[in-house]
Regions:
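Internal helix-turn-beta structural module
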Residues: 48, 286, 292-383
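Conserved phosphate/anionic-ligand binding catalytic regions in large, soluble enzymes, centered on
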Residues: 10-12, 16-21, 107-123, 224-248, ...
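A short glycine-rich, hydrophobically flanked beta-strand micro-motif that places a catalytic Asp/Glu
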Residues: 39-43, 157-163, 213-217, 283-294
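Short, charge-patterned binding micro-sites
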Residues: 42-60, 295-299
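N-terminal, positively charged regions that mediate nucleic acid binding
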Residues: 1-42, 368, 372
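Alpha-helical support elements that line or immediately flank enzyme active sites
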Residues: 14-33, 123-139, 259-282
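Glycine-rich anion/phosphate-binding loop at the beta-strand->alpha-helix junction
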Residues: 186-280
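Glycine-rich, mobile lid/loop segments that gate access to catalytic sites or pores
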Residues: 8, 68, 75, 81-225, ...
Length: 383
């Protein structure tokens, strides 16, 4: 990261069409795991005006009522749940993949993949400030709609925050963009005033707006038609919203719609868990963890740690400690983080790494990591 720069992150509300598809897919995963903790799920959702399609591979003791799940989830997001034709196209996991994943003594990775996790000491969430602020904006936008604080708001919306850094530290908010769906009768000047008062200013606790901050509310003007009526939604299209706002590398795999044997999900969560514990322990100010997996193989083929020269130990020592302390197989990650339990819909919105009660957000391994680093460092020093 450059010492002097502007970094930007975005977030979307739970009524955004792509994010609602993610939420539906995770609701399906949760329903499968509720009935069968060993369920194998890879669910994709596409939705457009008047139609929602759920498709993928599901191997479970019992297939849940997916149309009912879809209608309920759409209603919970603030739309009419019975206004769509629903089509479900599923089949069981490929026997070749099933054998590769489950045929050995250990569960193998459900696919190849490159996963990244990140943490920094910039905020109490141990995330970059633009990411935290963007998600806070969309949470407050949804709260303002649900609680009637701003009458006339509708479910679809998004936000973007640009933060200016000086000497590597957040200095000021350079720009805020909020776009929110609204009822036709709501005057735009009134909407802009209310969003500034009830959403934007309360969200900017760490860095209040200054006289030079550019604030844009519905910069395109009218935003009456939203959701699936305005844009086709698809799972896996909000990867940066789900993770680190584009400020950290991403391997390209989506999180939602997948059970824990898919390392796109379990590996990304585990990488965040490890990076957060490293930073929480004071072992580094910034930390990126990366894993690479091969389909059918339990152990990662690569593990790397990059602290951007902010660590109190070398990255090599930290990598050895990570390999020693954590079980990085799919079984190990599922067991450590409880990923065979139905929980994913709860953490699907407003970033997967902003929820303090998510298992991968725990900082319960700091002391173990510190001890492992000391031991590894002594071993390296005495070679």
């Amino acid at each position: 990261m450059k010492d002097n720069c502007i970094l930007t992150a975005e977030s979307v509300t739970e009524g955004h069409p792509d994010k609602l598809c993610d939420t539906i897919a995770d609701a399906v995963v949760d329903a499968c795991l509720t009935q069968d903790a060993a369920a194998r799920v890879a669910c994709e959702v596409m939705a457009t005006a008047g139609k929602i399609i759920a498709a993928g591979e599901i191997t479970a003791a019992k297939i849940p009522d997916i149309p009912a799940i879809i209608c309920r989830t759409v209603r919970e997001a603030g739309y009419g749940g019975s206004d769509y034709e629903v089509e479900v196209i599923t089949h069981e996991q490929s026997p070749d993949i099933a054998e590769a994943v489950c045929g050995g003594t250990e569960t193998g990775a459900g696919d190849q993949g490159i996963l990244y996790g990140f943490a920094c000491d910039e905020t109490k969430e141990l995330l970059p400030l633009p990411v935290v602020l963007a998600h806070r904006l969309t949470r407050l936008l949804t709260d303002a709609r649900r609680q009637g604080i701003i009458p006339g708001l509708r479910p679809d919306g998004k936000a973007q925050v640009s933060v200016e850094y000086r000497s590597g530290v957040p200095y000021r908010v350079a720009a805020v963009v909020v776009s929110c769906q609204h009822e036709e009768e709501l005057p735009l000047p009134e909407l802009r005033r209310d969003i500034l008062c009830h959403v934007i200013r309360p969200a900017m606790q760490e860095l209040p707006l200054d006289e030079h901050t550019e604030v844009l509310v519905n910069p395109s003007g009218r935003f009456v038609q939203g959701g699936f009526e305005a844009d086709t939604g698809l799972t896996g299209r909000k990867l940066m919203v789900d993770t680190y706002g584009g400020l950290v590398p991403h391997g390209g795999g989506a999180l939602s719609g997948k059970d824990g044997t898919k390392v796109d999900r379990s590996g990304a969560y585990m990488a965040r868990y490890i990076a957060k514990n490293i930073v929480a322990a004071g072992l580094a100010k910034r930390c990126t963890i990366s894993f690479a997996y091969a389909i059918g193989k339990a152990q990662p083929v690569a593990v790397t740690v990059d602290t951007e020269h902010t660590g109190i130990y070398s990255d090599d020592v930290l990598e050895q400690a990570v390999r020693t302390v954590f079980n990085l197989t799919p079984d190990g990650m599922i067991g450590t983080l409880g990923l065979d339990q139905p929980m994913f819909q709860k953490f699907c919105n407003y970033g997967h790494f902003t929820h303090a009660d998510a298992p991968w957000e725990r900082t319960d391994m700091t002391e173990v990591l510190e001890c492992a680093c000391r031991a590894k460092d002594m071993g390296v020093s005495h070679r």
